């Protein structure tokens, strides 16, 4: 385990790409122990000059879309291209143990054994916001360790699409054709955040369904406002199982990066993501500090009960809480 005495040496080993040190650094960053958090802050500050040169990808999709099969095929393609690949898999968590249920390593056999790959599951513990914070910090560790591509993967439910899109360069939505899932994706506003839509499982007797779904997505994209002026989102198809169409997806990602880098937009996006991350973390820290105050916690619960019982309007409750905070912290 990394400690104060070994921090400098651990940073050196991390910069050399030592997998064991990377795993230890991730464990340190994930720890909620106050001493570990203070040490991980020093670690993250020290590696920041070495971050920013990695391509950050987000991959999301509903259960059954074949994300693990796709990531296995895609990751192995990148390795054959001479690149180092890290996968950060934000998994659903066991409500009992808080641990990862799916265990992505067991579903990506070849990739997990590859020397140029690193896979790390991040249990969400039922709260995606906290998981996305850790995923962002783990991504920075991978960048400092010299990984060329970092992929953040999550289940496409709830707010997961926007959470992932806010921390990556290129956001990829993995879909399947048939069963109404294609239309459902359009209704969810998925099109507003996706840079690439990939329809998987274009194999067997599914070619017709895939072609219909592709036309549907392309039609929707043409009537929606672009996320970036420099980029028209593309709809691609593949069979991750048969490893077909994977190289076209990589070429499209390169086109995306080239277009946004040339205009300076990619740098702007990353800067804005950092600002939003700081703002969100500030809000969470302030709330944690407030609720750690027993007087505020008690007053909040009393106010909440009054609002529940309709003896106090939410607006008045908010005003009273604001006045309480003003008295406690600013007067």
Q: What are these model-predicted stretches?
A:
Residues 6-57, 65, 71-160, 167-174, ...:
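Nucleotide-state-sensitive switch-loop elements of NTP-binding domains
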Residues 179-208:
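Flexible active-site lid/hinge loop adjacent to a nucleotide/diphosphate
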């Amino acid at each position: 385990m990394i400690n104060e005495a070994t921090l400098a040496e651990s940073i050196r080993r991390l910069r050399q790409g030592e997998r064991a040190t990377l795993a230890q650094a991730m464990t340190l960053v994930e720890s909620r122990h106050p001493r570990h958090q203070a040490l991980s802050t020093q670690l993250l500050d020290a590696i920041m000059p070495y971050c920013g040169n990695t391509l950050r990808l987000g991959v999301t999709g509903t259960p059954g879309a074949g994300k693990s099969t796709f990531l296995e095929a895609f990751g192995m393609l990148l390795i054959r291209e001479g690149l180092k690949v890290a996968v950060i898999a934000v998994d659903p968590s066991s409500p009992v143990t808080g641990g990862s249920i799916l265990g992505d390593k067991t579903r990506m056999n070849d990739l997990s054994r590859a020397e140029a790959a690193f896979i790390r599951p991040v249990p969400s513990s039922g709260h995606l916001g906290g998981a996305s914070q850790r995923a962002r910090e783990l991504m920075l560790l991978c960048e400092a360790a010299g990984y060329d591509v970092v992929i953040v993967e999550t289940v496409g439910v709830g707010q997961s699409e926007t959470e992932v899109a806010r921390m990556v360069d290129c956001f990829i939505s993995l879909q399947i054709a048939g069963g109404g899932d294609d239309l459902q994706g359009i209704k969810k506003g998925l099109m507003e955040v996706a840079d690439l839509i990939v329809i998987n499982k274009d194999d067997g007797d599914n070619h017709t369904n895939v072609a219909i779904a592709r036309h549907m997505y392309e039609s929707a994209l043409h009537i929606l406002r672009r996320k970036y002026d420099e980029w028209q989102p593309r709809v691609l198809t593949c069979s991750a199982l048969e490893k077909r169409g994977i190289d076209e997806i990589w070429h499209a990602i390169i086109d995306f990066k080239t277009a946004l880098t040339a205009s300076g937009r990619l740098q702007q996006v990353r800067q804005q993501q950092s600002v939003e991350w700081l703002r969100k973390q500030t809000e969470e820290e302030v709330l944690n500090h407030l609720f750690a105050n027993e007087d505020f916690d008690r007053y909040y619960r009393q106010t909440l009960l009054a609002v529940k019982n309709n003896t106090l309007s939410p607006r008045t409750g908010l005003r009273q809480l604001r006045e309480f905070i003003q008295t406690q912290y600013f007067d």
